[in-house]
Amino acid sequence: MNSLFASTARGLEELLKTELEKLGAVECQVVQGGVHFQGDTRLIYQSLMWSRLASRIILPMGECKVYSDLDLYLGVQAINWTEIFNPGATFAVHFSGLNDTIRNSQYGAMKVKDAIVDAFTRKNLPRPNVDRESPDLRINVWLNKETASIALDLSGDGLHLRGYRDRAGLAPIKETLAAAIVMRSGWQPGTPLLDPMCGSGTLLIEAAMWATDRAPGLHRGHWGFSGWAQHDETIWQEVKAEAQTRARKGLAEYSSHFYGSDSDARVIERARSNARRAGIGELITFEVKDVAQLSNPLPKGPYGTVISNPPYGERLDSEPALIALHSLLGRIMKNQFGGWNLSLFSASPDLLGSLQLRADKQFKAKNGPLDCVQKNYHIAETTADSKPATVAEDYANRLRKNLKKLEKWARQEGIECYRLYDADLPEYNVAVDRYGDWAVIQEYAPPKTVDAQKARQRLFDIIAATLSVLGIPPNKLVLKTRERQKGKNQYQKMSEKGEFLEVSEYNARLWVNLTDYLDTGLFLDHRIARRMLGEMSQGKDFLNLFSYTGSASVHAGLGGARSTTTVDMSRTYLEWAERNLRLNGLSGRAHRLIQADCLGWLREANEQFDLIFIDPPTFSNSKRMEASFDVQRDHVALMKDLKRLLRKGGTIMFSNNKRGFRMDLEGLAELGLTAQEITQKTLSPDFARNRQIHNCWLICAA
């Protein structure tokens, strides 16, 4: 009997133990990452040929203590390598692990190689050659603290390489993991199996090979025992012949069918090729179609199983599409696959929540470095009085109600950008803005007391409901997370897409960027204030301070201003403002753009203006500004500087976003200024619920 070890992906150890026992292994012991077992030579070949779950089959050769590189050398050389190697066999060493002595795996591999080669030369035998690419023997050494474990890898290449997959095509899951997913799915061979996001077909091919009793090792051309002196070719050929006989019989007797689809025609062609190479191509029908086109291939029965490894995203901007995909799959399953089972393997349990289905079972496993979960569902048979579940129903109803009211109002006003929802319901704490046929969801960061998992799942529900209510494709929904802004955070870049969208606001055309910054380039709550500025601008010299992207300057210019002066500290936003002005035919000397610290420029300027708009930050201590600024503390001093630039009879429109702002009317009176609050006049219906979003004043000389 031989002591052996079968490695596997984390989470599959018990499944592998059961498989090995069915093959005849004894004394099976599960450890993290694999199973120790005992077996004769025939079992070695049986496990290599038939294990669908093992990554490698390892034959331990010995252990040694390593306190120095000499200890490693002598420990390896103590093994009788001349009785392990066939004459002329090539080899490679795979070394993993470090300690205080062996600090580099390449150095460790070199010492092992030297010890093996010297074992031959000391006996005056021809030294074996190293072949790193395709060796006859692969020696594995694991160093754990002071103990080195030396073993012969009888697999050669990893056992997940069945020989049917085009190596040029990347697979998101290895074949061994795919086999485990199929085994855990609850699918019964002989019943239909469908993968609506099949990619290169790995799940379906592994299922078909299992169902037709086709050994996973049948198509492999190279093994790790070809240079092993104890290899028994007779037994190996018997094992191989038995596998071939069983495969022919299994294929001839199998009567059910497999169905795969994917939106990418190239991967479907690859899947067909893989299935043909695996010898089960005739059992699988592959089609090019996306999930939206998914339908039950057997509406009259029998019931089957839908299985898939759907895509998941690591980037925030990919989530809307993925949530929509999972939500859509859930609806299709409930509408068309009543009585079927569903099994999905994913690195994102939150995305699986978007299915709006309750799992009967779940399993955990590792896919490389990723922690993954497999969830199994049974789809109840639908009845005539069955009502489809609504995702985030309260939120969806409120959004639908707001849309009905605001869409008509926006059309009448001639605006394309407006707020549809602003945390109307406390449990759905987001803002939803419409930009033409796009939507932006801004998630207000939940407090630390809220469970992060629940908050994320609720956000996914919000996205799914928003897409459903607005009827927009996922690629036209942008997701952002908004926290309380400090200083210049709101101006920091979030992305590098550089995609601009042209929108209309009354008679103005403006550029917005929905992805690259937290804000889009257009403050929607100031819409009416901008229109008022346009109405007040005829024949006047207009100054726009803290101008952002210059949308107020556009309205003033279109309103007939004699000149516009646009001042901001950011070159990026001034260039944006220039684009906005140019889009509306406003260019030339009459429309100046000045990059400067607005407060510093204000103190130095000696020009005169009839109409001034200023919307300063609530607080700023930018390194590029000469001093910190607090709008509550400093607004009177600000008005003093502004008055110096104001022509007789001129007007200042002053706005800020500080909640609870108190205008110092006495301080203004001492400057000879009067202030009229116009906040309510500047709030449009889409911001009617949030009356503190800004405050706005008209200030004139007394």
UniProtKB/Swiss-Prot annotation:
InterPro entries: 23SrRNA_methyltr_KL, DNA_methylase_N6_adenine_CS, RlmKL-like_Mtase, RlmKL-like_Mtase_CS, RlmL_1st, SAM-dep_methyl-trfase, SAM-dependent_MTases_sf, THUMP_dom. The keyword S-adenosyl-L-methionine applies. Gene3D superfamilies: 3.30.2130.30, RNA methyltransferase domain (HRMD) like, Vaccinia Virus protein VP39. Keywords: Cytoplasm, Methyltransferase, RNA-binding, rRNA processing, S-adenosyl-L-methionine, Transferase. One of its GO terms (cellular component) is cytoplasm. Its main location: cytoplasm. GO terms for molecular function: 23S rRNA (guanine(2445)-N(2))-methyltransferase activity; RNA binding; rRNA (guanine-N7-)-methyltransferase activity. PANTHER family: RIBOSOMAL RNA LARGE SUBUNIT METHYLTRANSFERASE K/L, RIBOSOMAL RNA LARGE SUBUNIT METHYLTRANSFERASE K_L. This is Ribosomal RNA large subunit methyltransferase K/L. It comes from Salmonella arizonae (strain ATCC BAA-731 / CDC346-86 / RSK2980). The gene is rlmL.
